[in-house]
């Protein structure tokens, strides 16, 4: 699963990408310093793995991972191919969710592509380009569906949904703001609309706003805008995050304490991104390895077993499950079993985040 980091030139998105991935994507104070998207594979922070590692002392600990793609800065006219626009839009099509970085700080030394700091204008600039691209996509699908309607009346339902979406897009709103039924979503699932992708907004703030980001009027504006899309906003100072990313262990902990934070803003971004993708983790624990496995929310036990090995899914008998909280409270799997806290679940069991599992199977 991939998240695309987007933003206008010079808002801090490549610096954030560098900090998240430590991949050293080229970063400079001029537009288009990222042309081909840089891709970084990032471990998802999970304190539960640290606790299990203390209990099992495993040979290795493996985190769940997600991919971030740093997509070059979009500009007005991208949907018409301006500013390498076609390339940018094709890169956005390839990601599952969007992380949009907006600038919420003043600094005369960092140029803004539009000459002034206005995060709502920046959001609109990008969203309108995505909306224009979606209108073009919807029009093509409508033409096709109307031709097919002559031979098969079932296409009327698809036409109805597409026209409903087009109306909202033409009002300058994203497709994700529309309430659609599961049936309607199914009808347009192959339309791949850019503004249907889930979105997370990153408000890049100054160091002086770290203690109380809510006092920043620009952040408030972004939060108000995001409400309509049921989107989350994470304020963070990307400059400070870059410093934090260069530190390890105690040094990082000391700096976090000095600025009054429990965890880095980037850790919050990664966790929120994982959730945005509709993902969660189940855990396996033993002396060889403590590991988090990525699954979609709503996944049943046999499908989760298949993440480990296809043979386990094929020969699934049952899943022996204990919750993370119960295991930590009791101190060992033996104690948890004695208390009756280890459950036996069958094929219809829907996995929960943090389930610690041993799959029984036979092939």
What is each PLM-predicted segment?
Residues 40-45, 72-82, 93-155, 168-181, ...:
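Conserved Switch II/interswitch segment of TRAFAC-class P-loop GTPases
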Residues 352-357:
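Structural motif
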Residues 56, 126-130, 238:
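A ubiquitous short alpha-helical element
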Residues 2-6, 17, 144-350, 362-363:
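C-terminal-of-GTPase-core extension/linker across diverse P-loop GTPases
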Residues 70, 359-360:
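Conserved metal-binding segment of the jelly-roll/cupin
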Residues 1-111, 139-140, 145:
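Conserved G1/Walker A P-loop phosphate-binding module
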Residues 32, 46-49, 62-68, 82-96, ...:
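Amphipathic alpha-helical transducer elements in NTP-driven molecular machines
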Residues 23-31, 38-40, 48-51, 80, ...:
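Glycine-rich, flexible loop/turn motifs
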């Amino acid at each position: 699963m991939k998240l695309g980091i987007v933003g206008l030139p010079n808002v801090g998105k490549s610096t954030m990408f560098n900090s998240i991935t430590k991949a050293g994507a080229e970063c400079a104070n001029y537009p288009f310093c990222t042309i081909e998207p840089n891709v970084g594979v990032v471990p998802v922070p999970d304190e539960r793995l640290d606790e299990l590692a203390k209990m099992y002392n495993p040979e290795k600990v493996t985190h769940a991972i997600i991919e971030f793609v740093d997509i070059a800065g979009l500009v007005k006219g991208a949907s018409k191919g301006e500013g390498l626009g076609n390339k940018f839009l094709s890169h956005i099509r390839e990601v599952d969710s969007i992380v949009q970085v907006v600038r919420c700080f003043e600094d005369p030394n960092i140029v803004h592509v539009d000459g002034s700091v206005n995060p709502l204008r920046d959001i609109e600039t990008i969203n309108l380009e995505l909306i224009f691209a979606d209108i073009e996509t919807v029009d093509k699908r409508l033409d096709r569906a109307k031709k097919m309607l002559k031979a098969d009346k079932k296409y009327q339902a698809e036409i109805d949904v597409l026209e409903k979406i087009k109306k909202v897009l033409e009002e300058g709103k994203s497709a994700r703001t529309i309430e659609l039924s599961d049936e309607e979503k199914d009808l347009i699932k192959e339309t791949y609309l850019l503004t249907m992708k889930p979105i997370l907004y990153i408000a890049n703030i100054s160091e002086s706003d770290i203690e109380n980001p809510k006092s920043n009027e620009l952040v408030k504006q972004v939060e108000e805008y995001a409400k309509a899309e049921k989107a989350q906003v994470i304020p963070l100072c990307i400059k400070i995050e870059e410093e934090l990313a260069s530190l390890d262990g105690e040094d990082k902990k000391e700096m976090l304490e000095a600025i009054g934070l429990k965890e880095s803003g980037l850790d919050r971004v990664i966790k929120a991104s994982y959730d945005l993708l509709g993902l969660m983790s189940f855990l396996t624990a033993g002396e060889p390895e403590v590991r988090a496995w990525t699954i979609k929310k709503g996944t049943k036990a046999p499908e989760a077993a298949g993440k480990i090995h296809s043979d386990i899914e094929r020969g699934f008998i049952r899943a022996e499950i204990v919750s993370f909280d119960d295991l930590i409270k009791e101190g060992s799997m033996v104690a948890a079993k004695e208390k009756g806290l280890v459950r036996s679940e069958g094929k219809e069991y829907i996995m929960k985040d943090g389930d610690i599992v041993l799959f029984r199977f036979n092939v």
